[in-house]
């Protein structure tokens, strides 16, 4: 049974080369995949983060959104030769009442506040290695053109009318709320005040003449879209939540405010007395980036994956698709939703003083280390908790000890004095398990390792396609542990290169371990790009050999040539990931019970 499994997973005899991309490549990716969408490598893919509000400095939740999109985009680039077929946008949302009020409180002009905070986001993303192709600011002239054109399309299709809106408005969330979404909260002096049930932020009663979007017309079209596209919103629980929202009637939506009340925004075309609602303004950024309203945007839309936090799900899963349908356009291909980061079980809050500065974390834990932590520990389905001890424990265990230790052991001069990729001996490790002979040294567990690593790229790709990057890293970590077990089991440091009996098996053990490391390094590129580069460079893997299309694993297992066999390793550059010092003062300690 094991032999059949290994042969099926590792390739077919008679093949000129063992190609994992051939056996487990794009033809296995679903048509709704995040990374490809079709079999062709040059099919366009467009990844977006939310544009981040500039009323406060960036925190780790913002960085997490950007890292999810970055890893998805980087993995997509590994799958094909054309990086021009991939776009990745992020940016800042700079209009609205909150910005207007925050600037006034700080004694700044709104433009000055926006410039200052937008620069903080740009610096953070540059330091964190976010590989965005576009950084959009909603104060840019190109965006104003796009928003006003989009408004004109909605108006020309009879979807905007002027009327008196009367109801609850939450300035903090920049949204209107029905009565059912408002509750009374006790105040410190015993009186009560109205707040949003969803966010807990205060709301106020508003009555004014606005432009109103006929959202009520789109309830059934939205239901048909979601029921016909079960992967449109992922993970599945969020898809279910949106369908539950759509069980209720959708009220028409106010999409402007009086300019006398809100002047910091984009004016309604032909009516300077009104300012376009900040969420309609903000959502159009996804079109601005790809050239809307020029025809070029059609080559990118709707091949889009929006990565968003769960707090803005309604805006992206109901309002935005309704706006698009109203404008005669398709909804986005995929909306990927993630939950929040808490700190020691509590929501991050300025008042609690527990907001974690991501730039401090990048400096303390290294860029690759903190990227790995957030993507390894972050689970989109539910909130994840942050504290420093968890970061140190994970990075020391998985990057410093398991992965770094494996690389050091297999490339150390004492074990590999020639500093080359040793030869693989097919008589020591035959492709048929269970063979008996004086030269056969491979054990059943060794075939299980080969099988696990051979299927790893396909498994990782499936996890990326299903927005489970944490599962992809879990799978890589599991194979790293298996490979360490393989090396420990055969103890190459006890074998002698001078012995005609030991030497072929010693070379084979190192060859298999280095091949496993090459797979790990290739698959870690989207998450830890610098660390992966260091690992692959140490193995002597050139830049042109690092895509999934070049990931031929263990071809000598079938006696086919291996391009790395006999190749000199790259230069020694120190530890792959130095262990973190646990004696340092924690930024955030875990609560002790």
Curated annotation (Swiss-Prot):
Q: Respond yes or no to whether keyword Mitochondrion is given for this record.
A: yes
Motif annotated as 'KMSKS' region, chain positions: 347-351
> Where is this protein localized, as stated in its record?
Mitochondrion matrix
- Please convey what the UniProt record notes about how activity depends on pH: Optimum pH is 7.8-8.2.
Q: Which Gene3D superfamilies match?
A: 2.170.220.10, HUPs (3.40.50.620), Isoleucyl-tRNA Synthetase, Domain 1 (1.10.730.10)
Binding of ATP occurs at 350
Q: Keywords of this protein's UniProt record, alphabetized? A: Aminoacyl-tRNA synthetase, ATP-binding, Deafness, Disease variant, Ligase, Mitochondrion, Neurodegeneration, Nucleotide-binding, Primary mitochondrial disease, Protein biosynthesis, Transit peptide
**Record-linked NCBIfam families:** metG (TIGR00398)
Q: Which family does it belong to?
A: Belongs to the class-I aminoacyl-tRNA synthetase family.
Q: What is this protein called?
A: Methionine--tRNA ligase, mitochondrial
């Amino acid at each position: 049974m094991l032999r059949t499994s290994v042969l099926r997973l590792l390739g077919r005899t008679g093949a000129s080369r063992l190609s994992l991309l051939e056996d487990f490549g794009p033809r296995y990716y679903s048509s709704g995949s995040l990374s490809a969408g079709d079999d062709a490598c040059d099919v366009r893919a467009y990844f977006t983060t939310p544009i981040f509000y500039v009323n406060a400095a960036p925190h780790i939740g913002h960085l997490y959104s950007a890292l999810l999109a970055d890893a998805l985009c980087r993995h997509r680039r590994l799958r094909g030769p054309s990086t021009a077929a991939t776009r990745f946008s992020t940016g800042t949302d700079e209009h609205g009442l909150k910005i207007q009020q925050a600037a006034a409180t700080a004694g700044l002009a709104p433009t000055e506040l926006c410039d200052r905070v937008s620069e903080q986001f740009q610096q953070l993303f540059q330091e964190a290695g976010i590989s965005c192709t576009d950084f959009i600011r909603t104060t840019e002239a190109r965006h104003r053109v796009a928003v006003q054109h989009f408004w004109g399309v909605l108006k020309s299709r009879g979807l905007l009318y002027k009327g008196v809106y009367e109801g609850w408005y939450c300035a903090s969330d920049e949204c209107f709320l029905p009565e059912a979404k408002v509750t009374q909260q006790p105040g410190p002096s015993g009186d009560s005040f109205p707040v949003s049930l969803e966010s807990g932020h205060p709301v106020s009663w508003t009555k004014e003449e606005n432009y109103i979007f006929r959202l009520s017309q789109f309830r059934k079209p939205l239901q048909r879209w979601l029921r016909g596209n079960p992967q449109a919103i992922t993970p599945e629980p969020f898809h279910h939540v949106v369908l539950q929202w759509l069980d209720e009637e959708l009220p028409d939506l106010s999409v402007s405010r009086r300019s006398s009340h809100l002047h910091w925004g984009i004016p309604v075309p032909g009516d300077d007395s009104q300012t376009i609602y900040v969420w309609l303004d903000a959502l159009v950024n996804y079109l601005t980036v790809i050239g809307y309203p020029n025809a070029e945007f059609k080559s990118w839309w709707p091949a889009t994956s929006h990565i968003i936090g769960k707090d803005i799900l309604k805006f992206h899963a109901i309002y935005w698709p309704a706006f698009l349908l109203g404008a005669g356009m398709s909804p986005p291909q995929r909306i990927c939703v993630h939950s929040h980061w808490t700190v020691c079980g509590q929501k991050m809050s300025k008042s609690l003083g527990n907001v974690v500065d991501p730039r401090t974390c990048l400096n303390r834990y290294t860029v690759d280390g903190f990227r790995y932590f957030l993507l390894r520990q972050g689970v989109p389905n539910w909130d994840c908790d942050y504290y420093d001890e968890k970061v140190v424990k994970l990075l020391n265990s998985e990057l410093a000890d398991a992965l770094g230790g494996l690389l050091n052991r297999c490339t150390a001069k004492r074990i590999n004095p020639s500093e080359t990729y040793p030869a693989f001996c097919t008589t020591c490790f035959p492709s048929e398990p269970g063979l008996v002979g004086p030269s056969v040294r491979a054990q059943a567990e060794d075939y299980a390792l080969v099988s696990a690593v051979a299927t790893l790229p396909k498994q990782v790709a499936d996890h990326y396609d299903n927005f489970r990057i944490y599962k992809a890293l879990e799978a890589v970590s599991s194979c790293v542990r298996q490979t360490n077990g393989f090396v420990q089991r055969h103890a190459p440091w006890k074998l002698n290169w001078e012995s005609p009996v030991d030497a072929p098996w010693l070379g084979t053990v190192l060859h298999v371990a280095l091949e496993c490391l090459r797979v790990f390094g290739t698959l870690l590129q989207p998450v830890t790009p610098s660390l992966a580069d260091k690992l692959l460079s140490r193995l002597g893997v050139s830049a042109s050999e690092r895509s999934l299309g070049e990931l031929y694993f263990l071809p000598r297992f079938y006696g086919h040539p291996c391009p790395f066999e006999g190749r000199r390793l790259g230069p020694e550059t120190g530890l792959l990931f130095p262990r973190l010092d646990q004696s340092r003062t924690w930024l955030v300690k875990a609560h002790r019970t």
